[in-house]
């Protein structure tokens, strides 16, 4: 895995050099258990620091869907991941993005409007600078279903739900949010 990290970081730096008008990003796996040790690092913050430095990363990006499992399920790793990303972004003075679950698949449920709002707003509460969606379109493999863009390339009900959430956020918070800087998070 360390060799893979080096190759990925090299590719990222090359993309920055060859296409400075583009914004390459490498989405990180979420932290869980001993993943840092699998990559050869003591802990996840050390891995994130090394990645940012080696890739000359201008932002961090990750996803963690553990709270979107079917049935009653609570996993503290959701907030642990937000904290790790937030702290690394603050240490390096770069933004972090969260890719939230928009499309049910495998054991992940179909996120309701409240689920989507919760994923977005918990990310923003931790200082997230960008929200992306997994996945925007419906892949034709496995059991992906009910994406914002359906298997026929048409807008689905989920697309309209996300549009309405964005409109609501922008109307309420857009003017102030972009000027804020995360200092503390409490729950």
Spans of model-derived segments:
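Glycan-processing catalytic domains of CAZymes
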Residues: 1-187
């Amino acid at each position: 895995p360390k060799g893979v990290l080096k190759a990925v970081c090299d590719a990222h730096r090359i993309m920055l050099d060859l296409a400075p008008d583009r914004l390459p990003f490498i989405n990180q796996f979420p932290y869980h258990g001993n993943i840092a040790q699998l990559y050869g690092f003591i802990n996840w913050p050390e891995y994130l620091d090394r990645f940012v430095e080696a890739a000359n990363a201008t932002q961090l990006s990750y996803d963690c869907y553990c709270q979107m499992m079917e049935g009653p399920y609570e996993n503290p790793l959701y907030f642990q991941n937000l904290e790790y990303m937030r702290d690394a972004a603050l240490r390096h003075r770069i933004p972090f993005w969260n890719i939230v679950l928009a499309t049910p698949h495998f054991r992940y449920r179909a996120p309701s409007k409240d689920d989507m709002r919760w994923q977005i707003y918990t990310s923003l509460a931790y200082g997230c600078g960008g929200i992306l969606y997994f996945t925007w379109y419906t892949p034709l493999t496995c059991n992906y279903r009910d994406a914002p863009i359906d298997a026929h390339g048409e807008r689905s009900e989920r697309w309209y739900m996300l549009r309405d959430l964005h409109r609501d956020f922008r109307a309420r918070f857009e003017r102030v949010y972009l000027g804020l800087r995360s200092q503390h998070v409490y729950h």
